[in-house]
């Protein structure tokens, strides 16, 4: 049962969130994309957005297409896998995925 709900990240505006992953520091890694909205340049939106545990934007990994899902993997848990409609991208990051 959830309680004390609050807005952490506002997705209002152009673009939309998709898959989400968390790292061991509590940062939120979100797949993001333009969603084909008129007048929106997808090159500015497509990729992965990283937020602090308090919801502050920290980084944007740009991809040539919308990131539909993502997860951490690799031997040390510091490789970010990003899936889109046509491609799978992977990059080593200075973070480790949270253990489930």
Model-derived segments and spans:
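Hydrophobic/aromatic beta-strand positions that recur at structurally equivalent sites within the blades
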Residues: 50-51, 91-93
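Short glycine/acidic-enriched loop and turn motifs that connect beta-strands
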Residues: 35-38, 87-89
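Blade-edge beta-strand/turn elements of extracellular beta-propeller
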Residues: 1-12, 48-63
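Beta-rich, blade/repeat-based domains predominating
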Residues: 6, 11-32, 64-79, 85
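A short loop-to-beta-strand structural motif that recurs across blades of beta-propeller domains
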Residues: 46-49, 87
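Short, solvent-exposed loop/turn segments at conserved positions within beta-propeller repeat blades
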Residues: 37-45
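Structural signature of WD-repeat beta-propellers
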Residues: 43, 83-84
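Short loop/turn segments immediately following beta-strands, especially the blade-tip
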Residues: 1, 92-100
